[in-house]
Each structure stands twice: as C-alpha cells, then as structure tokens.
A protein has these predicted regions:
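Catalytic core of Fe(II)/2-oxoglutarate
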Residues: 11
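Amphipathic alpha-helical segments
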Residues: 14-28
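Conserved active-site tyrosine of GNAT-family acetyltransferases
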Residues: 18-22, 88, 123
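Vicinal oxygen chelate
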Residues: 1-7, 28-79, 85-119, 129-135
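Acidic active-site catalytic centers that drive phospho-/nucleotidyl reactions
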Residues: 14, 80, 120-122
Length: 135
C-alpha cells in the first residue's frame, strides 16, 4: 500500500459513528486496529487516519472542544462533486457551505473548482471539490 507524504490523523469522539459517515460517502477502510480504536481510510488518493479519543491520549495537548479542527478545512478533490453533495443532502448531513463554483487566481490564470463544505460527526470541515479546469 502506498502512503501519502502527509496523512491527517483526526481525533474522533466515536470511531464507529465516524466510520459510518466516511464509509457512507465512499471511503474504504484500508486497515484497522480495533484494540486502539484506530482506522486508516482512503478515497482514491485521499487518505485519513481516525483515532478515537482516550483519556490517556499522548497527542492531546489541550481539551478538545466541538467543533474539532476549528480553523481548518480539508480540500478533497473528487470526480463527481454533485453526486456526493446530493447524497449528503439526502442523508441530512450538516452542509456548512452550499455547492458553488469558485475561480482562484494563480498568477495569470484562473483555476476553477465546484465545491462545498460539510461537517463530519466531530465538526471537521471537509471541502469536496471538483476540478473545472483553468481559464
């Protein structure tokens, strides 16, 4: 298995709930360590690690308050953003920003994305994005 050079590990309050959410939107469990309440997930080239919070968590440097990941969002490039968006809306997931087209300047060209933001069960923001090319 190939591991990306950067793989976010998200602290979650309930691994089972988080796995249901991520699997529902297409993530695959690559491997698990049930004894540690840990799972490694992938969706295409996107990789995440999930670890259920424990009271003796050595990685926790301050109390975790909902929503987790405050101040950050993860951009996940997918091939069909409309399909994921519709599915999440149909399942009453908390959409933070509705789907829209955005064009971002890179030097002299504009790069397009069709994107939206959704919160996972612990409040992490996931920005699903589809490449619209450049102009």
């Amino acid at each position: 298995m190939y591991f990306n050079k950067m793989i976010p590990e998200l602290s979650v309050t309930n691994l089972e709930n988080s796995l249901k959410f991520y699997q529902t939107i297409g993530f695959k469990i690559e491997y698990e360590r049930p004894e540690n309440k840990f799972a490694f997930l992938s969706l295409g080239e996107i990789q995440f690690m999930l670890q259920e919070i424990s009271k003796d968590d050595k990685w926790k440097i301050s109390p975790l308050l909902y929503p987790f990941g405050n101040g950050i969002n993860f951009q996940l490039e997918v091939e069909n953003v409309d399909k994921i968006y519709s599915f999440l809306k149909d399942h009453n997931c908390k959409i933070a920003f509705e789907i829209e087209e955005n064009w971002y300047r890179q030097d002299e060209k504009l790069l397009g994305n069709k994107e939206f933001l959704v919160q996972d069960p612990d409040g992490y923001l996931l920005r699903f994005s589809e490449d619209l090319g450049c102009k």
